[in-house]
Swiss-Prot record:
NCBIfam families: PRK02260.1-4 (NF002604). Involved in the synthesis of autoinducer 2 (AI-2) which is secreted by bacteria and is used to communicate both the cell density and the metabolic potential of the environment. The regulation of gene expression in response to changes in cell density is called quorum sensing. Catalyzes the transformation of S-ribosylhomocysteine (RHC) to homocysteine (HC) and 4,5-dihydroxy-2,3-pentadione (DPD). The gene is luxS. The keyword Iron applies. Belongs to the LuxS family. Keywords: Autoinducer synthesis, Iron, Lyase, Metal-binding, Quorum sensing. This is S-ribosylhomocysteine lyase. It comes from Borrelia garinii subsp. bavariensis (strain ATCC BAA-2496 / DSM 23469 / PBi) (Borreliella bavariensis). GO terms for biological process: quorum sensing. InterPro entries: LuxS_sf, Metalloenz_LuxS/M16, S-ribosylhomocysteinase. Its cofactor is Fe cation.
Amino acid sequence: MKKITSFTIDHTKLNPGIYVSRKDTFENVIFTTIDIRIKAPNIEPIIENAAIHTIEHIGATLLRNNEVWTEKIVYFGPMGCRTGFYLIIFGNYESKDLIDLISWLFSEIVNFSEPIPGASHKECGNYKDHNLDMAKYESSKYLQILNNIKEENLKYP
């Protein structure tokens, strides 16, 4: 079986950052998959499930309600390894093109004070598994990277 692209990245050299994971074209439409890497794989502790779940709910809601990006957002969700998120967007983008959007997103999560979107029994399959305080903590740690982003945080090793 052919190895998928994400398994060809050397995770021993991967830093937190923003990376273009892949670009796909379907019927002349380009989709860019962004690797929002919050943790250094196999070095830092993974994001606890309740925090990653909360970031997913708030992040997806904020992105789909962003006036500039709403029509371009296809998907926002956690990686199975719990070291970050994937963002799939319509269009041909590079990592640097997403710095402002992703910085805005995680700043909004740090300052989020409303009820967690979609966190009721009717709206979520695991509605009790949320932790807003830890979501804010993980987001604030990631913002430290974003606020001082370097080339090594924008290009896969």
